[in-house]
Amino acid sequence: MKASEISSQKIMDSIRPLPEAGKQEQSSAERALLPPEMEAAGLSLFMDGDALTLTDGTNTLCGDFTRMKKRLREANLRQELLVKAARIKSLQDDRKPVILDATAGLGEDSMLLAAAGHQVELYERDPVIAALLADALRRAAEDPALAEAAGRMHLHSGDSEAAMREYAQRMHRETTKKSEICLQNKEDVKAEEKCAETQKRDSDQAGMNGDETADAELTAIDIIYLDPMFPGRHKSGLVGKKFQLLQQLESPCADEEELMQAALAAEPAKIIIKRPAKGPYLAGRKPSYSLMGKTVRYDCLVFPENHHV
């Protein structure tokens, strides 16, 4: 069975608790349904207590938001560079921008954004990583200190590039439809002005059509967040031997230009790109500005014409 044929839900459904005798005695029947290449590498998934866990027989890794609680305190959140990067001043009613995290991983960056009040749509293409993240979100939803933020995080197991392009197409279709309705309404208004006394019924109907246009408006994505795997480096927050487990599943970004073009096609008001502090720009695209940390920086591409107010 190919990795593409195994969904995160199938993986979750196939999980069995770890036998009391320990990891090494776990039979093949008790292991999760995994891609053949993962099993060949000696990796397996099991339930360690309440947590879905990835192991190579020596090291283990699971999604865990509980260790982030200190960072999620309001005073600390305000100092997070990513939270600062996600600000857009021109939105109406001081609402928080809606964010699409196109490279979710284990979701730690998205948790920061959700704790800051953002709705976050998370995309993770690797089914095993998506399963680890889904399990972490399940446990977070049961933790009073994390439940509110977890409730703003919506996980999609799949290819974010395809999702962003499909979103762009939907927005284009909706914009075209709205433009056609608006044009028709304007033509109706002109006709009404010429024969207001004899065509009042047509005038009333045109007004009704205008109301329907507002109701059909799609919820827009304001910000797209990209944190692709950088060759020779790794995502911040995952270090040492535990990271090596995840690295066997998640490969460096194969085509930076394709990822960037998919994000641009969705026409967000801002694209935020997480990079190593001294790393090159993603796809060679110079940002509008950058926020620099000790080990990482956030390159921000701003598109005022795309602000969804």
Question: Residue locations for each model-derived region?
Answer:
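Intrinsically disordered, low-complexity terminal tails and inter-domain linkers enriched
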Residues: I6-A29, A168-A220
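Mobile active-site "lid"/loop adjacent to the S-adenosyl-L-methionine
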Residues: P228-L259
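SAM cofactor-binding core of SAM-dependent methyltransferases
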Residues: V98-L100, A104-A145, S157-G158
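Conserved proline-anchored active-site loop of SAM-dependent methyltransferases
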Residues: I99-L112, A220-G240
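A short, acidic, amphipathic alpha-helical segment used as a generic capping/interface helix at domain edges
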Residues: A163-E166, R170-M171, S251-L264
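S-adenosyl-L-methionine
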Residues: M1-K96, L132-K178, N185, D211-L218
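Conserved Class I SAM-dependent methyltransferase catalytic core
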Residues: E256-V302
